[in-house]
């Protein structure tokens, strides 16, 4: 009987303990565009719900992706009498904690909505993801996992592996971190409060490095030594892994040793002092079968707009022209000046209905009114079209040639024998025709910098030769006779020099 009662009491107590451990649910709203040199709230709205608590000791906001040390800062603004803030530049993390006692969730909501992001660079770039969580572990949205550095100077890799496996975080099972992306390098190494052991080893097979903890258990991430290769992802420091003295375990390098967040191989115990003495280990939480589904973290995003591509345009002569621009986020604003002013158009494709001269336009994707963001130039080029002309030619006699004159304001002048010909018969301003038997039309066109003029026709009139008949005229000596051309309405030139239709002569001879 006593055993039955004890069993019931035990079950009752277990049930009560589970109910008291309900985790809060966090939900942030915010996907915003940042204007350089400004301060922008990291969220547009924050929601915190908890079925059994009204407050908590502290909350943490970290720039978990895209963080730039020395430029990015999170600041609590406004008046919050129950909450104090502390910024850790190394981790890119702002801690909000109670002045005395636990602030309420409503007070934390107001504080989080008052946290602003600033960047000191003149031309910042990239995207920032902000992780808001109730625990000290770093949260990475892309994996949904948590990462926590545990200081423990001199701890061996084996003991660190066991300690990590014995750790839990809001019900999530811990393990030595398995780092499989650049983002994980940043959050678990570069932005961690210290460096230490991670879950990689080649103890089982020298030169074959595997993850031996967590969901990636058994996954090979490196083959070989210093000059090896990775089938997936690895982030060894320069000249690592070098296996100097049974170094079979992966460790994040100490600050100041090589590239931040990179790895080196150490023995199970490492060095007894200095940079290669283990100072702790990195525990990762998440991804283990049976882990609870939690909402103790939430994220928001701020993106710094960047013009990713512009397409200038060129046309010959006045007319409509279309320019293009794209950005990573936001709407494209078009301006006539590199700074200041108001947009003349918003959109990716900008058409100017009539443009007469080459004009520079400027684009950005910042919110309207953002005056400090860089604009990118897009040029609409109007290339001049040549203006051509010619001297009207005189009629020419049949079976003779003539010289034609033309001119152009720009470029090269080409002559064609038809309006649709593509191959010129002559290039230049003075063209001598071949002998012409019939009236002929030539065409001229100039081209300058790829821009052709309209083609102009130059008609050449060919006048048939007069049909002259030979004639013998008899007249008396010491008299004169008038020779008749027999053709009227023409110009005349006799062999005597006369220029009239008829010609008087007084001596025998041959006249033409």
Language-model segments: what does each one mean?
Residues 1-22, 370, 383, 463:
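Bacterial Sec-dependent N-terminal signal peptides
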Residues 52-59, 70-72, 196, 207, ...:
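Short beta-strand/loop motifs in extracellular/secreted proteins, especially
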Residues 91-102, 146-149, 250-252, 323, ...:
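Generic recognition of long tandem-repeat/solenoid scaffolds
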Residues 64, 99, 135, 200-203, ...:
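Structured loops at beta-to-helix junctions and adjacent beta-edge loops in soluble globular domains
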Residues 120-305:
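Extracellular, disulfide-bonded carbohydrate-recognition/adhesion ectodomains
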Residues 20-142, 255, 263-265, 285-307:
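Extracellular glycosylation-rich, acidic/polar low-complexity regions of adhesion-
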Residues 301-512:
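Proline- and Ser/Thr-rich low-complexity, intrinsically disordered segments
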Residues 69-78, 215-220, 338-342, 419-426:
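Acidic Ser/Thr/Pro-rich low-complexity disordered segments
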């Amino acid at each position: 009987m006593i055993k039955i009662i004890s069993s019931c009491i035990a079950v009752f107590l277990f049930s009560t303990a589970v109910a008291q451990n309900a985790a809060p649910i966090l939900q942030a709203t915010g996907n915003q565009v940042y204007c350089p040199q400004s301060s922008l709230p990291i969220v547009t709205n924050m929601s915190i719900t908890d079925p059994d608590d009204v407050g908590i000791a502290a909350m943490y906001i970290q720039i978990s992706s895209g963080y730039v040390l020395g430029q990015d800062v999170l600041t609590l603004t406004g008046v919050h009498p129950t909450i104090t803030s502390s910024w850790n530049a190394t981790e890119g993390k702002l801690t909000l904690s109670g002045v005395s006692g636990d602030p309420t969730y409503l007070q934390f909501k107001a504080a989080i909505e008052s946290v602003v992001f600033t960047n000191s660079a003149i031309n910042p770039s990239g995207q920032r993801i902000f992780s808001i969580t109730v625990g000290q572990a770093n949260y990475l949205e892309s994996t949904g996992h948590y990462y926590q550095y545990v200081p423990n100077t001199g701890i061996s890799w084996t003991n660190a592996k066991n300690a990590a496996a014995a750790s839990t975080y809001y019900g999530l099972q811990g393990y030595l971190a398995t780092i499989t992306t650049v983002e994980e390098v940043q959050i678990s190494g570069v932005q961690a409060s210290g460096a230490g052991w991670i879950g990689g080893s080649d103890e089982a097979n020298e030169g074959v490095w595997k993850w031996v903890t967590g969901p990636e258990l058994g996954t090979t991430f490196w083959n070989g030594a210093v000059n090896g290769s990775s089938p997936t992802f690895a982030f060894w420091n320069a000249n690592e892994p070098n296996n100097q003295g049974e170094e079979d375990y992966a460790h994040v390098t100490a600050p100041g040793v090589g590239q931040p967040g990179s790895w080196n191989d150490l023995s199970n115990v490492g060095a007894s002092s200095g940079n290669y003495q283990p100072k702790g280990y990195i525990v990762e939480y998440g991804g283990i079968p049976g882990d609870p589904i939690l909402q103790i973290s939430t994220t928001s995003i701020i993106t710094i707009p960047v013009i990713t591509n512009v397409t200038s345009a060129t046309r010959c002569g006045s007319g409509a022209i279309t320019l293009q621009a794209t950005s990573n986020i936001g709407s494209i604003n078009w301006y006539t000046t590199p700074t200041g002013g108001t947009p003349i158009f918003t959109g990716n494709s900008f058409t100017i209905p009539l443009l007469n001269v080459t004009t520079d336009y400027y684009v950005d994707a910042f919110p309207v009114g953002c005056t400090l963001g860089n604009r990118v130039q897009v040029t609409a080029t109007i290339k001049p079209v040549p203006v051509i002309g010619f001297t009207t030619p005189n009629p020419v006699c049949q079976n003779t040639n003539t010289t034609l004159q033309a001119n152009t304001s720009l470029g090269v002048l080409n002559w064609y024998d038809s309006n649709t010909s593509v191959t010129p018969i002559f290039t230049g301003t003075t063209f001598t025709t071949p002998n012409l038997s019939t009236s002929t039309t030539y065409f001229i066109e100039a081209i300058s910098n790829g821009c052709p003029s309209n083609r102009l026709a130059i008609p050449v009139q060919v006048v048939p030769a007069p049909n002259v008949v030979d004639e013998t005229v008899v007249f008396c000596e010491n008299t004169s006779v008038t020779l008749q051309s027999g053709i009227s309405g023409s110009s005349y030139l006799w062999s005597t020099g006369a220029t009239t239709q008829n010609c008087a002569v007084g001596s025998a001879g041959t006249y033409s």
